């Protein structure tokens, strides 16, 4: 247990000098000694070693506020990486990046600690999965179905509904799935974390969820490591043979925290100012989120898209790791259609006749073809009007507009705002409804009948009321 002294402090990055024969290893945790003076530095502040600069100096990231630090302060090496409590004691609790409780409900009842830096499972331990995970959200189940043990990304710009979609997925899957979930809040609004906690409490599933938060107001060191803390807890449950749900909101903030400290660590920035280690950092996290022969981790990650540009390096790097991508579109949100999922842009490896079955595959593809035809005709309609279209095209446009409205759905978590009760639509009902639409069995119904309903039967009932 060697003791060093702070020699330089630039924001979240702190250089600490140790005796040359007792330098801490990379990723070791260091703790600020209580100096007893009137400094307002955070007591027990933890640092994580990032680089060894030579001459006994190590460069570290402060996992907490560096306010009040000064040169000469004593820092003790723990000789081990950051370790957090894991196991059943974490369920129903809210923790920070270091696994300390922040819900004022006493200490975490767990004897087992695990380092947040772990190796990804070996290739021969991995277990591919083709079982479908029903979400009860029509557009997702139809066009971009999720796999159990798969990885899903919710892509969208600011304010198109990533968090609401994720909350609805948690609401539908965590309740139906009855397994354990881990939620990592990375650099998001504290209010959303609070809403999530109360949502889980009100629906009586709090005892099945472990929550880890490093929110917007916290230093970059916390936001950079909080995803790993949550993942470590999820891995522990997976390794005891369970099927786990792992939610991350938002993976972009993880990248951004890395960008914030990258320049301070002395790295040259790469494209758009991102850290040069972007792909490696993302790979380290994503390769650990995987299913093994022992248990599975199904992960759902919200990904913020800066300026709605999907080619930005951060979302583009995330794309590589996912099985299903749900792309939220501002144009669809502008039409008032929620969830604002773009059915032409969203993809899934599971949308394969050998996985989902021929009927599901054909209905999904026919829905996409109809919507694509409407997209192509939109310019003609804008310039010349509907009257100039051929009868076949008019029919395609009418069907596409009904499909577009039928892809909307009232959410349970949005009941407070919309005033209409949420709907969970089973996969069979979803396929039946869209099959009737593309087969022309609903051509006589008005468009409004399909907006914000659950199953196709509700659309028929709504049509009767509209007449």
From Swiss-Prot:
Q: Which InterPro entries match?
A: AAA+_ATPase (IPR003593), ATP-synt_VA_C (IPR055190), ATP_synth_F1_bsu (IPR005722), ATPase_a/bsu_AS (IPR020003), ATPase_alpha/beta_chains (IPR050053), ATPase_F1/V1/A1_a/bsu_N (IPR004100), ATPase_F1/V1/A1_a/bsu_N_sf (IPR036121), ATPase_F1/V1/A1_a/bsu_nucl-bd (IPR000194)
* One cellular component (GO) term of this entry: proton-transporting ATP synthase complex
What's one Pfam family here? ATP-synt_VA_C
Reaction catalysis annotation: ATP + H2O + 4 H(+)(in) = ADP + phosphate + 5 H(+)(out)
* Protein topology in the membrane: Peripheral membrane protein
* Binding, ATP: 156-163
Superkingdom of this entry's organism?
Bacteria
Q: For this protein, what is the EC number?
A: 7.1.2.2
Annotated keywords: ATP synthesis, ATP-binding, Cell inner membrane, Cell membrane, CF(1), Hydrogen ion transport, Ion transport, Membrane, Nucleotide-binding, Translocase, Transport
Q: Do you know which SUPFAM superfamilies this protein is assigned to?
A: C-terminal domain of alpha and beta subunits of F1 ATP synthase (SSF47917), N-terminal domain of alpha and beta subunits of F1 ATP synthase (SSF50615), P-loop containing nucleoside triphosphate hydrolases (SSF52540)
Give the enzyme class.
translocase
Q: Name one GO molecular function term.
A: ATP hydrolysis activity
Compartments annotated for it: namely: Cell inner membrane
| Primary localization | membrane
Which residues are connected by disulfide bridges in this protein?
none
Protein family per UniProt: Belongs to the ATPase alpha/beta chains family.
The subunit field of the Swiss-Prot or TrEMBL record says: F-type ATPases have 2 components, CF(1) - the catalytic core - and CF(0) - the membrane proton channel. CF(1) has five subunits: alpha(3), beta(3), gamma(1), delta(1), epsilon(1). CF(0) has three main subunits: a(1), b(2) and c(9-12). The alpha and beta chains form an alternating ring which encloses part of the gamma chain. CF(1) is attached to CF(0) by a central stalk formed by the gamma and epsilon chains, while a peripheral stalk is formed by the delta and b chains.
Please give the function described in this protein's UniProt entry.
Produces ATP from ADP in the presence of a proton gradient across the membrane. The catalytic sites are hosted primarily by the beta subunits.
Q: PANTHER family from the entry?
A: ATP SYNTHASE, ATP SYNTHASE SUBUNIT BETA, MITOCHONDRIAL
Name of protein? ATP synthase subunit beta
**Organism annotation:** Cupriavidus necator (strain ATCC 17699 / DSM 428 / KCTC 22496 / NCIMB 10442 / H16 / Stanier 337)
Q: What is the lineage of its organism?
A: Bacteria, Pseudomonadati, Pseudomonadota, Betaproteobacteria, Burkholderiales
